[in-house]
Amino acid sequence: MGNVFANLFKGLFGKKEMRILMVGLDAAGKTTILYKLKLGEIVTTIPTIGFNVETVEYKNISFTVWDVGGQDKIRPLWRHYFQNTQGLIFVVDSNDRERIGEAREELMRMLAEDELRDAVLLIFANKQDLPNAMNAAEITDKLGLHSLRNRNWYIQATCATSGDGLYEGLDWLSNQLKNANR
């Protein structure tokens, strides 16, 4: 009987967990974002070959964030991380106008995958501190986000180095998780 109450208490007041897959083209800022959220500081990064995984605690939610390398040669490996993903963070370098079309192709390819059909989508429009950065509305248009049907999505302007916008993105993810559990 005590176990029933313990489980009920945990369900009401315990930590919720959310599995997040963070992807995007190479040099978009994924690893910088991960460690800014985890450590609160900027770390020196090198191109990710493989993945980094960290748990980020925020507002009584334990986010397990998988940061997977974005170089074109290793993008086919992304699909190995799709299973059980509840939230997808797609990081875009807002200053990289030349590759926004490539980013759109990769995003749409992923969203067509059956294993990600229930995952919510958060776009981090990163590097907003740079003078020629595209704003969130322009990125929304160039990624074709308004054409998405049956998918909860949100775009957040961010700057990984200062941390601007990162926690607002986690707020949106945590609200999606709470709404899904109702």
Swiss-Prot record:
Q: What is its main location?
A: Golgi
Keyword GTP-binding part of the UniProt annotation:
yes
- What's its EC? 3.6.5.2
Task: Report how it sits in the membrane.
Answer: Lipid-anchor
> What happens without the gene?
Conditional RNAi-mediated knockdown in the eye results in aberrant compound eye morphogenesis. Maternal RNAi-mediated knockdown results in abnormal aggregation of Golgi apparatus and disrupted cleavage furrow ingression in early embryos.
Catalysed reaction, written as an equation:
GTP + H2O = GDP + phosphate + H(+)
Q: Where is this region: Important for the stable binding to the membranes?
A: 3-16
Q: Which GO terms describe its biological process?
A: ARF protein signal transduction; compound eye development; compound eye morphogenesis; endocytosis; Golgi to plasma membrane protein transport; hematopoietic stem cell homeostasis; imaginal disc-derived wing morphogenesis; intracellular protein transport
What molecular functions are annotated in GO for this chain? GTP binding; GTPase activity
Q: Which residues bind GTP?
A: G24, L25, D26, A27, A28, G29, K30, T31, T32, N126, K127, Q128, D129, A160
Modulation of this protein's activity: Alternates between an inactive GDP-bound form and an active GTP-bound form. Activated by a guanine nucleotide-exchange factor (GEF) and inactivated by GTPase-activating protein (GAP).
Q: Which CDD domains match?
A: Arf1_5_like
Q: Name one Pfam family in it.
A: Arf
Its cellular-component GO annotations read: apical part of cell; cleavage furrow; cytoplasm; cytosol; endosome; Golgi apparatus; Golgi membrane; Golgi stack
Location within or outside the cell:
Golgi apparatus membrane; Cytoplasm, Cytosol
Q: Which UniProt keywords apply?
A: Cytoplasm, ER-Golgi transport, Golgi apparatus, GTP-binding, Hydrolase, Lipoprotein, Membrane, Myristate, Nucleotide-binding, Protein transport, Transport
N-myristoyl glycine lipid attachment residues: G2
Keyword Flavoprotein on this protein? no
The UniProt similarity line reads: Belongs to the small GTPase superfamily. Arf family.
Under the heading PANTHER family, the entry gives:
ADP RIBOSYLATION FACTOR-RELATED
Known role: Small GTPase involved in protein trafficking between different compartments. Modulates vesicle budding and uncoating within the Golgi complex. In its GTP-bound form, triggers the recruitment of coatomer proteins to the Golgi membrane. The hydrolysis of ARF1-bound GTP, which is mediated by ARFGAPs proteins, is required for dissociation of coat proteins from Golgi membranes and vesicles. Has a role in eye development. Required for cleavage furrow ingression in embryonic cells.
Q: Know the name of this protein? A: ADP-ribosylation factor 1
Tell me the name of the encoding gene: Arf1
